[in-house]
């Protein structure tokens, strides 16, 4: 698997800024509420358990988490959650494919905001299905190096030995741990299996990953693509963005 891209670095640094002004908490609350529609008990709702894990990792207050669960499961006195998950697709400069997952209570508003942002940055919002075939849904589990004994780094040999027993098909060692990859349907078993083997599981999620990546002709074009991705990520309704821009 390719290493972390410049876009990944932008997302990580931006997440810190967002957390300071509450934007991350708002997004996480939306994700929890949507997941809670299938049941407010995280023990029987893996999607909800995943969303709660993300919220806890971001240090979201427990009261905020409980309110989001209540809203999604219909227990909130102010009414049930009206959010819906929608996928949008489009093209960035140079034909870069962009896939956007949004949580919104107003499809028309979200589509208009996305279209304006694409146009402003040299891209175009496309029709459903125009780029989805260029991606595949994957499982990713993030391991902490704190569970390693080899100088605070994940032992590749130990990880490989453990992965032979699980439904994993790839991994990547990173500075503060490792990322384990698997098929879309394997996420629940993969994170549980790694935890049972003694690894510290910091997080897990379903992601869209490009089947192939494309590069830009020059630095200016690449910068334009990165600016588009960052602008899209700043929209309130946008939950997650994937692209096939080469690292």
Swiss-Prot record:
It holds the Pfam family TACO1_YebC_N. GO terms for cellular component: cytosol. GO terms for molecular function: DNA binding. This is Probable transcriptional regulatory protein PMT_1423. One of its GO terms (biological process) is regulation of DNA-templated transcription. Gene3D superfamilies: 1.10.10.200, 3.30.70.980. Keywords: Cytoplasm, DNA-binding, Transcription, Transcription regulation. It is found in: Cytoplasm. Belongs to the TACO1 family. HAMAP family: Transcrip_reg_TACO1 (MF_00693).
């Amino acid at each position: 698997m390719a290493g972390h891209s410049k876009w990944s670095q932008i997302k990580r640094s931006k997440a810190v800024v967002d957390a300071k002004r509450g934007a991350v908490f708002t997004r996480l609350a939306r994700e929890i509420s949507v997941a809670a529609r299938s049941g407010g008990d995280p023990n029987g709702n893996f999607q909800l358990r995943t969303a709660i894990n993300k919220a806890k990792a971001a240090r979201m207050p427990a009261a905020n988490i409980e309110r989001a669960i209540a809203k999604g499961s219909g227990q909130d006195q102010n009414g049930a959650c009206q959010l819906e998950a929608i996928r949008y697709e489009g093209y960035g400069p140079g034909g870069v494919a962009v896939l956007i997952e949004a949580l919104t209570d107003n499809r028309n508003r979200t589509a208009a905001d996305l279209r304006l942002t694409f146009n402003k940055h040299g891209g175009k919002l496309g029709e459903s299905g125009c780029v989805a075939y260029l991606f595949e849904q994957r499982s990713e589990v993030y391991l902490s190096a704190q569970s390693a004994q080899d100088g605070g780094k994940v032992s590749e040999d130990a990880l490989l030995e453990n992965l032979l027993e699980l439904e994993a098909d790839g991994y990547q060692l990173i500075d503060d741990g490792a990322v384990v990859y698997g098929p879309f349907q394997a996420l629940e078993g993969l994170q549980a299996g790694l935890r049972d083997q003694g690894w510290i599981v910091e997080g897990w999620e379903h992601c869209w990953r490009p089947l192939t990546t494309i590069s830009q002709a020059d630095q200016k074009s690449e910068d334009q693509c990165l600016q588009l991705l960052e602008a899209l990520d700043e929209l309130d309704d946008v939950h997650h963005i994937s692209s096939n821009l080469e690292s």
